[in-house]
From Swiss-Prot:
Protein family membership: Belongs to the bacterial glucokinase family.
Entry keyword set: ATP-binding, Kinase, Nucleotide-binding, Transferase
Protein name listed in UniProt: Glucokinase-like protein PD_0680
GO cellular component: cytosol
């Protein structure tokens, strides 16, 4: 069960948890649950726009205010973590270093975790009301679960059952090469290769990716783009006022279905797929109308096996914080 956040300060030891994306940072004070089976309790959840602040330290300092009792912090963020703790990412507006955060905020401990690794830990707290079933059986088989979602980039992680202490494998699936199936997709990828030697999956499956696909479609049809943002494209598609905007979302959903099917087979994710990220809940209706399921199952003889894999859309904005807190509490318990 996802905890209901409150604004009251906890009377038990607590820590700071943050979900840092390329566009927004969500922050909360977290109190440890009374048992490992209970979800952590969130207090005073706030959302900040990254573009409004010069650094993550500034955001966290604003949130902490006079909370001098909070001494520890866990941060979920996209990117690859180096051995020295710093994060390599193309999607954040500023560097991310636990050493700098610890010094800037006078904290005892700052831990970093991959955002989709954190989200994978939150699957234990999801309720049916937070999930939209897209395909497959209502009950999944036992086995690994795939977490994937487009936002500022494309995040992905694998949750692996392990006798009550699951293992989560963060990945950089969004940096793998973008595959193409149809003639149109091949033309799009060839166009994208005009000014680069590698087209990653997230070049199409992300917020910026929607704009990349739209511009490529415009170029292929020799027309000038009418929209300059993913939101404008989505609004035009919803209003039915621009055929290329509608086609952009169709191509986006086709790519998504095909790639999710590929990753399920690569990772053996028989435990199901959870689609998350900041974009898909906003594209719920185009996704439901799309060929997503058809493309997900279009894997030759393996399509029959994929029919037994449930795919669900996650609709809960605080799961990143909950998952980061779960990860941190598990770390402290070992």
């Amino acid at each position: 069960m996802i905890p209901t956040p409150t604004r009251d300060a906890p009377n038990i030891p607590s820590f700071l948890a943050a979900d840092v994306g390329g566009t927004h940072v969500r922050v909360s004070v977290v109190a440890a649950a009374p048992t490992c089976a209970s979800p952590p309790q969130l207090f005073d959840v706030r959302t900040y726009r990254c573009a409004d602040y010069p650094s993550l330290s500034t955001i966290l300092n604003d949130f902490l205010g006079t909370r001098s009792a909070v001494r520890d912090c866990v941060i979920a963020s996209a990117g690859f973590q180096r051995s020295d703790g710093t994060v390599i990412t193309t999607n954040l507006p500023w560097p991310l270093s636990p050493h700098r955060l610890r010094a800037d905020l006078n904290l005892a401990e700052v831990c970093l975790v991959n955002d989709f690794e954190a989200l994978a830990y939150a699957t234990e707290d999801m309720e049916p009301a937070q999930l939209l079933h897209l395909t497959g059986p209502a009950k999944a088989q036992d086995g690994p679960r795939l977490l994937l979602g487009p936002g500022t980039g494309l995040g992905a992680a694998l949750w692996i059952p392990n006798n009550g202490r699951p293992i989560v494998l963060p990945t950089e699936a969004g940096q793998a090469a973008l595959p193409s199936t149809t003639e149109l997709e091949m033309q799009l990828v060839r166009h994208m290769l005009n000014n680069r030697t590698h087209v990653p999956i997230e070049h199409a499956l992300s917020g910026p990716g929607i704009l990349n696909v739209y511009r490529a479609l415009c170029a292929l049809q020799s027309v000038l783009p009418q929209h300059a943002s993913p939101d404008a494209i989505s609004h035009a598609a919803a209003a039915g006022t621009d055929m290329l905007s509608s086609q952009t979302l169709e191509v986006f959903c086709d790519f998504l279905g095909s790639i999710v099917g590929d990753l399920v087979m690569m990772y053996g994710a028989q435990g199901g797929v959870y689609l998350a990220g900041g974009i898909l809940p906003q594209l719920r209706e185009p996704l439901l109308r799309s060929h997503f399921v058809e493309r997900f199952l279009n894997k030759g003889p393996m399509g029959e096996a994929l029919q037994h894999v449930p795919v669900r859309l996650i609709e809960h904005g605080q799961l990143g914080i909950v998952g980061a807190a779960r990860w941190y509490l598990n770390k402290k318990a070992t």
